[in-house]
């Protein structure tokens, strides 16, 4: 460890198989060469069901130190996380405490009281939990007790300019007037990349047959949660319009989605609950088109991952997806215009390259770990300098 190296503690409540868990590891990787990096995993059976409590802090071979605190759930953790969190902070005396999402905002005042000299940083990804469910008692309570204290953080980082603007509208000057930076999100270019040789039409057909998709002449892919903002209904309508193409969706197959599939008799829709990253790469590479019709996204990684793997994407011209992908791939003006997505599919299956390769390379460079690390450490260096004044 370098002399005078500042130490930083990242706080995350989800495992490495989730997007937040992977992002936490990406952040640790980004800073571990310049900072003494630690991570506190706030563990619950929901996200760490296959793990046992560790007796000691663990030095990870990836260059950081892991700590953990257990609770039965994030709800009970609202109370039970506090005391052991304070104890860890007193022992570590970190220079910076970095929270991975606003739902952990209830711990910001705890950190400020336990380590008044430490700078707190909050990563803001979107404002969907805050704004999309105004009549939900669950989300009202989540906002009031968990998220609202987020504004007490010393500084903020955002995944997109769009998110930064939306956060300013919702949280107001308590957030917008504090130090902040857009750091984006990275993709693992060692994993999400083109194969050494192009995937042939026969290889794609063989891939489909192996996974039970027989007698289809193409495959579309969608990776998403079942939330109204994801606009999965339009993806299914696209499937109805092109019955000779297989439409794969990765994500939970809810009762609502099952009802749509059954009602429309969508025999060409195939659901997979989840993949590990390497399986997902194979689906990206063997798909003909990634379809991402979301009304709202804070960033939108899946279409970027798909393009990195050599497969084109078509997306809705909305929110942060527009910010990231305009000029790179086709964007549909009206997010629920299923025929417009189907028309792009027809172009792809006819052999047209719908991607601007130069713009795509620029995007992938911006989303590389190297670029991400530069933005993250650049912002944290500023915080360190301000702290030492």
PLM regions: where:
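N-terminal strand-loop element at the rim of the active site
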Residues: 13-18, 30-76, 163, 178-179
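Conserved donor-binding/catalytic core segment of Leloir-type glycosyltransferases
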Residues: 9, 212-230, 239
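Nucleotide-activated donor-binding/catalytic signature segment of Leloir-type glycosyltransferases, i.e.
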Residues: 258-281
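Short alpha-helical donor nucleotide-sugar binding micro-motif in glycosyltransferases
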Residues: 282-287
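Membrane-proximal helix-turn-helix segments that form the acceptor-binding/catalytic region
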Residues: 138-156
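Conserved acidic donor-binding segment of nucleotide-sugar-dependent glycosyltransferases
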Residues: 330-339, 347-352
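Short hydrophobic beta-strand element within catalytic cores of glycosyltransferases
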Residues: 312-315
């Amino acid at each position: 460890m370098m002399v005078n190296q500042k130490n930083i503690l990242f706080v995350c409540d989800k495992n490495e198989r989730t997007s937040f868990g992977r992002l936490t590891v990406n952040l640790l990787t980004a800073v571990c060469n310049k900072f003494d990096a630690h991570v506190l995993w706030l563990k619950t059976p929901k996200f760490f069901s296959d793990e046992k409590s560790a007796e000691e802090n663990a030095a990870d071979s990836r260059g950081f130190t892991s700590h953990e605190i257990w609770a039965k759930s994030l709800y009970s953790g609202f109370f039970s996380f506090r005391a052991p969190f304070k104890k860890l902070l007193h022992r570590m005396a970190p220079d910076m405490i970095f929270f991975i999402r606003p739902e952990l905002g209830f711990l910001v005042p705890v950190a400020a009281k336990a380590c008044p000299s430490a700078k707190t940083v909050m990563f803001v990804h979107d404002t969907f939990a805050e704004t999309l469910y105004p009549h939900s008692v669950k989300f009202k309570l989540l906002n009031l007790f968990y998220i609202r204290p987020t504004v007490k953080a010393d500084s903020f980082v955002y995944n997109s300019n769009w998110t930064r603007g939306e956060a300013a509208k919702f949280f107001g000057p308590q957030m917008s007037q504090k130090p902040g930076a857009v750091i984006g999100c990275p993709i693992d270019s060692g994993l999400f990349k083109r194969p050494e040789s192009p995937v042939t039409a026969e290889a794609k057909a063989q891939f489909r047959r192996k996974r039970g998709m027989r007698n289809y002449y193409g495959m579309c892919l969608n990776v998403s949660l079942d939330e109204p903002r994801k606009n999965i209904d339009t993806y299914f309508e696209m499937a109805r319009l092109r019955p000779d193409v297989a439409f794969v969706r990765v994500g939970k197959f809810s009762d609502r989605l099952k009802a749509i599939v059954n009602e429309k008799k969508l025999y060409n829709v195939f659901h997979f609950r989840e993949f590990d990253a390497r399986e997902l790469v194979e689906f990206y590479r063997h798909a003909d088109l990634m379809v991402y019709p979301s009304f709202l996204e804070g960033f939108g990684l899946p279409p970027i991952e798909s393009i990195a793997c050599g497969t084109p994407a078509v997306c809705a011209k909305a929110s942060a997806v527009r910010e990231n992908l305009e000029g790179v791939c086709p964007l549909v003006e009206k997010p629920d215009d299923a025929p417009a997505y189907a028309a792009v599919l027809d172009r792809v299956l006819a052999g047209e390259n719908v991607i601007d390769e130069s713009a795509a390379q620029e995007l992938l460079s911006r989303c590389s770990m190297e670029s991400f690390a530069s933005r993250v450490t650049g912002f944290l260096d500023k915080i360190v300098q301000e702290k030492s004044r």
